[in-house]
Amino acid sequence: MSDQIDTRTAWLSPDLLASVRANVPLVYVDAIPVRVDESGRVTQVGLLLRVASDGSISRMLVSGRVLYGERVRDALIRHLEKDLGPLALPKVPANPAPFTIAEYFPDPDISGFVDPRHHAVSLAYVVPVSGDCTPTQQALDLAWFTPAEAASAKIAADMTGGQDRLLRLALAHVGELP
């Protein structure tokens, strides 16, 4: 078993991960990084530019797997810092609650949320960040948009896998869907 799981990081071997993806839904987190004003109103939405699971270059949310033995809060912080840099300073509550749950399937007709690799259940959060955000890891760019720009058809056309729908749900949740 030790050759299948790195117990220090809870990562599965590539072969075991492929087997799990083929047979078991995985738990993910999606995070919409936002900047807020002094009253807490969302003024900007951060979107990454990266290679999506379908191979396209797309605007995307912060997203990633929750590791075995990892708290959801810790997974959120890990993925936010991995994609936005260690100085992003995300404001994640002690016990975060998702604004929605998105189920990603290889088949686009099931839920409208698509990941060609597997079935994933993703807890979605809006997370204010107050620090210096710089794209890292696989992200090619990070751009900040007003809520109206983020909800536009132009941005939706640059997104894939149904993440534009998740972004609009997030904007509605914070009262910023135009």
Question: How does the language model describe each region?
Answer:
Residues 1-39, 114-115:
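Acidic, metal-coordinating catalytic segment for phosphate/diphosphate chemistry
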Residues 40-89:
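Conserved Nudix-box catalytic region and its N-terminal flanking loop in Nudix hydrolases
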Residues 32, 81, 106-107:
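A structural signal for the main folded, soluble domain(s) of proteins
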Residues 85-133:
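Active-site segment of metal-dependent pyrophosphate-handling enzymes
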Residues 33-35, 49, 129:
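Residue-level signal for short segments within beta-strands and strand-turn junctions
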Residues 31, 76, 125-127:
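A structural signal for short, well-ordered beta-strand segments
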